[in-house]
Amino acid sequence: MKIIQTAVEFAPFIKAGGLGDAVYGLSKALSESHDVEVLLPFFPLITPSFSSQVIDEKVFSYEFLGRQHAHSISYSYEGMILTIIKLDSQLDLFSTSTIYTEDDTLRFSAFSAAAAAYIGELDHVDIVHMHDWHMGLLSGLLKEPNRPHYPKRIFTIHNFSYRGYCSTQLLGTSGISDFGLSNYQLYRDPQMSVLLKGALYCSDYITTVSPTYAQEILNDYSDYEMHDAIMARRHVFCGILNGIDEQIWNPETDASLAVNYSKDLLDAPDVLFTKKEENKNALYEKLGLSYEYSPLMCIISRIVEQKGPEFMKAAILHAMENGYALVIVGTCYDPEIQRKFTNLQESLTTSPNIRIILDYNDPLARLVYGAADMICIPSHFEPCGLTQLIGMRYGTVPLVRSTGGLADTVVTGINGFTFSQTDNFNDFLHMLTLAITTYRQEPDIWFQLVEEGMLRSSGLTTMAIHYLGVYNSLL
């Protein structure tokens, strides 16, 4: 089967969040038994310094704001083809130093138009799998009646809150027909279009990244036209849980840990916990924390509204009052949140048990996973979430809000602790207290939580099998 995956992120070369990990992970898993090609826009951030062979180059034209040209370079990479498409410099859309800007609907629609032209020149494609609203226009362009062939179109919603609102006139410059364009237009304002809306109507099948998040999307009434669109397509919509690359996320081989360990040590829990304690000591020494504070809770997250920054602050106070350690590692994108957390960071510089690191540092984050006893994820909503899966892999018990993929993967008393979907701080603080008390007073129960998490299979194979089931149902 010839499968094309297309997105604007692909770990490790261009990544801002979980999207890059998910696209890489799925592509890698599928490439073990199928012909997989990944299409990415060129960014200055992408530096193909990897030792991959250039296997093809093309120059081709496409329609978007007039006749444009693009240059594609295809590399052989980890059993798949990685094709980077550089748009004509006349538009100068991808010379930015960041993945995302204020002109993203323009930039990613132009890339979608170029990707459609590139795919049209290929001899045969069975499946085109498009990821998130950025690729929304591509679905409509691939459905146009003048296409030389019609690959089946799969679209995955990674975050339903981001939809790609833009002008209808802009999309019309891609050469899409009036009928195709109507799938994107808003009824309430035909001069405006939504990339995600059009993708829902134009794709053969739609997925999202967890079963519970799929139900939450169906119950989302924040925009009645988007609700109508997803309800009209609910018979070809499902949630497939993301996985993690268990080779990349492996405490047995992770070079960032002070001491390695594995689930094989579950037969010798004292040895397992001793090794985690050694990682904890290494982290405490690195961050200047006092060894007397235990357990260690961590938060590894983007610090944005979605992730519940007000609950993170509540966790800081709870840690101070209850004598345990808390380490927060994350990046802020909102200036106001950045200001507040920078002030918190500075005020806690000499704290014996709290540290805030406002910079995502992968080796440090990995050491935190290996050192921590528990990981807290208080997100207001979480389409899937990967940090709870990584945490369990490293023997770190997740404490989460019961929403989206967190609800699908964490069960109180089985492999972690949960609190309700309401914004009730008492529920959240009760969860924290229960977790701390269990750790301190019920070591046998705590070990069972760790064991269940470490034995859980969260790899890529299961995710790939589910997607192959969708692909095969369409062919």
Swiss-Prot record:
Pathway: Glycan biosynthesis; glycogen biosynthesis. Its EC number is 2.4.1.21. Keywords: Glycogen biosynthesis, Glycosyltransferase, Transferase. It comes from the Bacteria. It catalyses: [(1->4)-alpha-D-glucosyl](n) + ADP-alpha-D-glucose = [(1->4)-alpha-D-glucosyl](n+1) + ADP + H(+). ADP-alpha-D-glucose binds at K15. Signal peptide: none annotated. Belongs to the glycosyltransferase 1 family. Bacterial/plant glycogen synthase subfamily. Synthesizes alpha-1,4-glucan chains using ADP-glucose. This is Glycogen synthase.
